């Protein structure tokens, strides 16, 4: 029997901050399981989860407004430690008898907090000392409202020049509020504060580790599927690859992977997937060459969302046909990860907007009565990569730049044709090869080439050519919500451009995209 890796757990109530998932990832990094729920949960749900501690996230609302989100009253009666972050601190203060006011001045960016009262949350943690010998902490603020009076049974632990209550605490009840964001890297000692709360104050053990997550997943897969057969759509991406390796470890040859080669993959990617998973790891893989079918379906379609939906529809059709050929398959495996679960829950409650349609397996034929196996559904992407390494998958594959589900279908602008895909594949491969050679690949967050359906005049030797244009795109980002274009060296860009134009017959011009996000998105379509 494996350890119960869910025995100690933290509940994070989400008030809408862009950083909330980061809070959860930090808690997981500390080796403790946590879940992220909407703020309006019931007492019964909290009791059922039985957390060792609760974190109230930040959020964009104002506690001074009527009908603004509030923590359930039971949070403060559950007998477990509570940490309020930014908005979470403000609603804690207001609900427990303090006072919050709107401010004409937003405090956004770095601040230095001076600790004036001893507290279990920050004891022994400091970045520097004040002239009076008090600990100073470099933190990241992002708030408009501020607490102007703390509840009567709380003490002020720390303050800044403009924020009199930067940290408040009720040590007896183990309630803590911080006006800054400990989860972001700009708060230099933030992870230590979260560790103090989660590991010391909430007394959680570090049971959530890659090796134990794998053991737990394998055991749960075996319990769920028994001696049945399982089918998985393997794309070669991180999520489906790690799902395949977990299932293979759990049930061996009773897993069948279906790899649909849609003709929209990167250079040599289909061969690499078959070599790695079929020849090297010995998985049972059905290779379905379907390039012509996808390109026929995409003929005449130039609108991005229509292309996405067409690619998704044809994928489901092809996958369904292959699934029906297999006998006695009772389960469908999917590489759903925890952010997908969070997004689905938000969509179901009307708290999120769909910006782009997701490319995923769905709509299996009604005659196929299959159960769903989702071994990654509790994991964030960084956790999936770590267990992939533990399972033996190569680092370069797990830490590749993101690649869209529809593949080159949304990197060829306008109508998708085989000629365009072939040119783009080779241009993209040269760009990535040169990034790796110059030790720049891991210094940018994402890099790729885009095919532009416009012709441009060029000169080759004594002749003129009238060929296609390719754009290079490279960005730097922390969360992919915002991004800066990567300032790659001019000589590097010149070398990439020369190679693409000289080595690929059909491309006469290379341009570099210098648009940030916002206003542009990272992908062109």
From Swiss-Prot:
Pfam families: GATase, GMP_synt_C, NAD_synthase. Residues 208-400 form the GMPS ATP-PPase domain. Pathway: Purine metabolism; GMP biosynthesis; GMP from XMP (L-Gln route): step 1/1. Residues 9-207 form the Glutamine amidotransferase type-1 domain. Keywords: ATP-binding, Glutamine amidotransferase, GMP biosynthesis, Ligase, Nucleotide-binding, Purine biosynthesis. Its EC number is 6.3.5.2. InterPro entries: Class_I_gatase-like, GATASE, GMP_synth_C, GMP_synth_GATase, GMP_synthase, GMPS_ATP_PPase_dom, NAD/GMP_synthase, Rossmann-like_a/b/a_fold. The keyword Coiled coil does not apply. One of its GO terms (cellular component) is cytosol. This is GMP synthase [glutamine-hydrolyzing]. It comes from Cronobacter sakazakii (strain ATCC BAA-894). The gene is guaA.
